[in-house]
């Protein structure tokens, strides 16, 4: 499981940073890639990675500001340029209006897609658990921005314990159906009368990962709830230390506020993104260092950077 950042800038494309988009790679878990936001130029950024557009099965949009959605019609169209047998349906989750935005762009440009898009639109009254599969659950809450904006909490369900096959062999259990029974938690009796207790050969379930990905926001308690105990918190850092007033007026956060959210939520790791173009080079290093005074496990990410979870 990895996060790869396709765009880490704020507002408009800059030389060092494209606008907002990231992907959560779940290839080992479910052979899928989930995209969060799709600012303009996202498909160009993808060309610099190993990401296959057909693997992108779900797109989560945080809000309707252009730097988070203007790349969506182009990406969806480019995704169509694949062999027919590789076409897979796509789910798009986002605020009310995302369907109209996408379909208007596709219709007026004469674009035809060889796959279906399933839209899931939300307003403030329909948030909470927005998606569940056998391996993942996704929750959403309203953040505090200048327009309706959501943050997402992706929860991996606990992983089953693994079978200690070597220990079973040493215990004299023949490979075959008995292995399967033990793996399923059944006790078995061998021909010599010995009983094999399944739980002695299966490790404890492994806690699933929690990944919190926030859209643009002022400092808000909703961010804390979404990030509670998260393995990774991705939080915007449009402004730096001392910029709290201007951040609030524009519906954004500073690096220090993001760090405080991570600390209050007892998150394990904080990744800062959505950085204003006025911060470059050493300024970015300083933003990270300042945030570390509040939350030590902080990192300010760069475009195309990949982070393991």
From Swiss-Prot:
Cofactor annotation comment: Binds 2 Zn(2+) ions.
A GO MF term: zinc ion binding
Pfam (any one): Lactamase_B
Listed EC numbers: 3.1.26.11
Cofactor field: Zn(2+)
Active-site residues per Swiss-Prot or TrEMBL entry: 67
Binding-site residues for Zn(2+) 1, renumbered to this chain: 63, 65, 145, 216
Subunit structure: Homodimer.
Function text: Zinc phosphodiesterase, which displays some tRNA 3'-processing endonuclease activity. Probably involved in tRNA maturation, by removing a 3'-trailer from precursor tRNA.
Family per similarity comment: Belongs to the RNase Z family.
Protein name, UniProt field: Ribonuclease Z
UniProt source species: Streptococcus agalactiae serotype Ia (strain ATCC 27591 / A909 / CDC SS700)
